[in-house]
Amino acid sequence: IYLFLGAPNERSTAQPERDFYIYMLRPYLKTPFKDEQKPDELFFELNHSDDRFEQFLKRYAAADDLKIDATPAMKNLYQRKIDSYFKELTKWLNDNFVTTFNITYRGKKGSVLDFGMFLPGNATIQEIINIVAEGLLTDWFAQKYPDYPIFGEIKDGYLSKSNLEAYVKEALQCLMGKETRMGLAILNGLVLLDNSNKVTAKKSGYANWVKALLETKGQGQVLNYNELIETIYIRGVEDLQYTKEFRLEPELLVVVLAAMISAGDLEITIDAKTYNATNLNEYVQLPLSKLSR
């Protein structure tokens, strides 16, 4: 997901493609653009404010401007004012976001409440945006990636860069018998549990995909990392990595492979050391950055 400050026609063409685009439209000096009502575009726009917000915004802008040519001593004074005004602006936005911002998705416009979103008490702006995005973009994601796992038991309802590593580590510990709610949520989403919550790789389409690739190999041949993972580069720099089937994050593939090791379906060699069902405990203790590479 990309979060842009501005309109679609202000987005740099150099930016790599993403599955979703969230736009925070300019509240002032608005840029005209045509809403093409795309299923992967979501817009937030400040609909109205009040005198308090306007005053703090003007003071913030003035202090930021005056700081440029100020003496070192005055720069510190203006920076304190900038920080103070920014804090007030942030508080106002947190307190009033639900009632003062409009959402537009596929031509429909309204407030968070108009879209029927359930928000937890004291939700931050980031949490509100995440909840709205999940609620409105989930159907499109399911159409685009129908075989991507559903993690319905995850606390926040979705995986993100900020929580993925923690969930994956818990899932790996579950394979060692240390069951946690977080770990089971990942294993369940990857179809690595039977009806009794026991680990199995037999029913998982993700595990069966890996197994099918292994079966195409001749005796003594190995399945290499780059046969499972697609790496996307932008101007020669690594941007994203996904599995070639299902578009799984490499971290989720680690869980699938670990479950297959546990079941005796495969062995993995990392840095000349081979891991199988007898030393799975050593495998899951490796840094996730090494396991997912």
Residues covered by each model-derived region:
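Extended alpha-helical scaffold and adjacent linker segments that couple domains
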Residues: I1-R293
